[in-house]
Swiss-Prot record:
This protein's GO CC annotations: cytoplasm; nuclear speck; nucleus
GO MF: calmodulin binding; DNA-binding transcription activator activity, RNA polymerase II-specific; RNA polymerase II cis-regulatory region sequence-specific DNA binding
Pfam families attached to this UniProt entry: HMG_box (PF00505)
Localisation: Nucleus speckle; Cytoplasm; Nucleus
Task of the protein: Transcriptional regulator that controls a genetic switch in male development. It is necessary and sufficient for initiating male sex determination by directing the development of supporting cell precursors (pre-Sertoli cells) as Sertoli rather than granulosa cells. Involved in different aspects of gene regulation including promoter activation or repression. Binds to the DNA consensus sequence 5'-[AT]AACAA[AT]-3'. SRY HMG box recognizes DNA by partial intercalation in the minor groove and promotes DNA bending. Also involved in pre-mRNA splicing.
Gene Ontology biological process terms, A to Z: cell differentiation; male sex determination; sex differentiation
Keywords: Activator, Calmodulin-binding, Cytoplasm, Differentiation, DNA-binding, Nucleus, Sexual differentiation, Transcription, Transcription regulation
Family named by the database record: Belongs to the SRY family.
Descriptive protein name: Sex-determining region Y protein
Source species of the chain: Neophocaena phocaenoides
Keyword Transcription carried by entry: yes
DNA-binding region listed in the record: 54-122
Region span, Disordered: 33-52, 164-196
Major localisation: nucleus
Amino acid sequence: MFRIVNGEDYSPAVQQRNILDFGKAPSLLWTDNGSSNDRCDTGGNCRESGQDRVKRPMNAFIVWSRDQRRKVALENPQMQNSEISKRLGYDWKMLTEAEKQPFFEEAQRLRAMHRDKYPGYKYRPRRKAKEATEIASRRLFSTVQPNAHRGDLVPLHIQGHTFTNGKPVKPLTAHEHKQLTPATGASQQSDKPAPQ
């Protein structure tokens, strides 16, 4: 049932051990050499090797959860990572401020080290492709103005296509267009229901 590829065992136990071993070496998280190869070793995205991307310093929760994640995973080898994360979030909330204080201090120390090492650092979150598409779509359709009489969106015409609420629709007939035009049809025909 377990796969062995190129002589390596991919059983759940081995995968769990590999995950746990990764967190044991703090040198993997913070390296002195900021080369692209180090970013691949630290869990960064190797596809970004051409860019000089600097990771954010760890916050107090991340500092605390590194060791806790390892402990929870050892106690519950079958527990999924998402479930471990939920449990860690709950456990962190249950800690008192006094219990959290050493981790806040460590996070502050790491921030200071990070600031010294990267003085011009500014956090620039990476946008996912889907988010960029949604933002472009919102900008495109932000020019659509509400119709004063009906409260609906006025159709937006772009190169022979009509869009309403960001979705293409069939072109209006002359009669439909006349009914939707505020100056002529909608105000004069108030006794008739508007077409839906």
